[in-house]
């Protein structure tokens, strides 16, 4: 029997996984060799240098110490570079193994994803859209919370196929164009995994924009605080060098009083920006991957990514700036460092001022970027599903040309996507005309309920933009 397209895809992925595992094993051997070299250079350098110093050959000893130090640092640099690449390779291998498990419906090796159906949803539970072995668990390979919510919305609201502003035909075209771009999908997923295994949380980023910084005349306050800290340092040095009275206590008291008066407005901000730079780094890495990509044959992808790829100034520049500001404010997580910095300069006020300016500039653009990433992420999840199942077909919308044509549903060889191919039974279906129905009969355990679920779950997939 001639292998199908899915069989060939499965064999190709298996060969790729085995080749990657061999590369990983070779890298592990090389890493062990680097460790031995580092240990050997350290021990040899210590023994030879100490012996030379004991002979009072200090200049020779200094030269040898420098040579061994340079050699050790060089080997360490190459070793660290290798370990970084091995870590990247390990994450990439996990992505490929997860995809292979989804192709084989190997549920124990599929990454677990939790989805909850909307309350009183008419068909989500009956059609196995949610649950541990559900359709969403199978197709959800998203890297962002917005993408995860969007792909679920496309399935839950398949009876409202334009609920997110994109028609289901546009979604299908987008998914079609993304299907062959497996390298782009893997790069975006890998970019976020290198930073954290947790999904990119767009809601946290949006919350930073929605809450305004309510400090009047912030720029003037920052200037005054800088003047007070500078005056405190100058007067403190004057007192230290000349023994003058402690006049530095006066500007310091005013500065501390100003800080505590504003702490009520600043404190809620820390809860939103603490560790937010990690989420921004994920967003930057994904957008940077898109900025480096070209889409010569994907006009729909270009249209969806228009807000990111057609900006005069690259979004990554603004987001990196915002990430550095959030890192600066996250110093509050280290109390001693935070106290020392604010004693020397108005650290918090300075970064709050910079944050206020950046937020004002990104208040409109950043939600659009996140929305674009969410749409692309959700479509990429369906595209990965289509890539893993090349035998599946893309549904087509029927168009009536005469008044005698009746609208309906036609399917040939329709099977349940959650049943393994070896055990899957396919059926044909044709239902036309308003008010018409099909009566499904059969004995117990003959597959009547499975057939009805097959029709329903494939309708959800089709209207979400995926193949069936």
PLM region spans:
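Alpha-helical bundle segments enriched in helix-capping/polar residues
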Residues: 2-436
């Amino acid at each position: 029997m001639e292998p199908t397209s899915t069989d060939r895809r499965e064999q190709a992925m298996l060969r790729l996984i085995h080749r990657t595992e061999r590369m990983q094993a070779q890298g592990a051997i090389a890493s062990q060799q680097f460790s031995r070299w580092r240990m050997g250079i350290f021990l040899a350098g210590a023994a030879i240098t100490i012996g030379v110093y004991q002979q009072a050959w200090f200049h020779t000893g200094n030269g040898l110490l420098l040579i061994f130090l340079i050699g050790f640092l060089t080997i360490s640099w190459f070793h660290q570079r290798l370990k970084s690449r091995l870590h990247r390779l390990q994450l990439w291998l996990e992505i490929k193994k997860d995809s292979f498990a989804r192709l084989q419906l190997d549920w124990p090796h599929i990454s677990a994803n939790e989805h909850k159906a909307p309350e009183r949803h008419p068909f989500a539970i009956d059609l196995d859209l949610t649950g541990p072995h559900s359709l969403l668990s199978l197709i959800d390979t998203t890297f962002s919370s917005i993408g995860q919510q969007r792909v679920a919305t496309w399935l839950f609201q398949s009876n409202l196929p334009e609920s997110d502003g994109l028609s289901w035909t546009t979604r299908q075209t987008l998914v079609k164009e993304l299907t062959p771009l497996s390298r782009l999908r893997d790069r975006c997923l890998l970019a976020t995994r290198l930073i954290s295994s947790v999904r990119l949380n767009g809601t946290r980023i949006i919350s930073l924009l929605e809450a305004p910084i309510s400090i009047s005349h912030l720029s003037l306050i920052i200037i005054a605080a800088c003047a007070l800290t500078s005056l405190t340092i100058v007067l403190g040095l004057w007192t230290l060098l000349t023994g003058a009275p402690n006049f530095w206590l006066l500007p310091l008291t005013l500065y501390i009083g100003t800080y505590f008066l504003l702490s009520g407005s600043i404190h809620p901000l820390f809860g939103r920006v603490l560790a937010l730079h990690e989420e921004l780094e994920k967003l930057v890495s994904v957008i940077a991957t898109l900025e480096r990509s070209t889409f010569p044959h994907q006009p729909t992808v270009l249209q969806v990514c228009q807000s990111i790829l057609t900006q005069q100034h690259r979004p990554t520049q603004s987001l990196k700036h915002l990430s550095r500001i959030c890192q600066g404010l996250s110093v509050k997580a280290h109390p001693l460092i935070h106290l020392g910095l604010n004693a020397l300069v108005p650290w918090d006020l300075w970064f709050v001022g910079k944050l206020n300016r950046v937020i004002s500039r990104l208040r409109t653009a950043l939600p659009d970027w996140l929305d674009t990433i969410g749409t692309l992420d959700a479509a990429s999840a369906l595209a990965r599903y289509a890539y893993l199942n090349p035998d599946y077909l893309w549904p087509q919308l029927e168009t009536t040309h005469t008044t005698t044509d009746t609208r309906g549903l036609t399917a040939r060889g329709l099977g349940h996507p959650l049943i393994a191919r070896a055990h899957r039974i396919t059926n044909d279906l044709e239902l036309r005309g308003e008010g018409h129905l099909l009566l499904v009969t059969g004995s117990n355990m003959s597959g009547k309920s499975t057939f009805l679920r097959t029709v329903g779950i494939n309708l959800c997939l089709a209207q979400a933009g995926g193949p069936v």
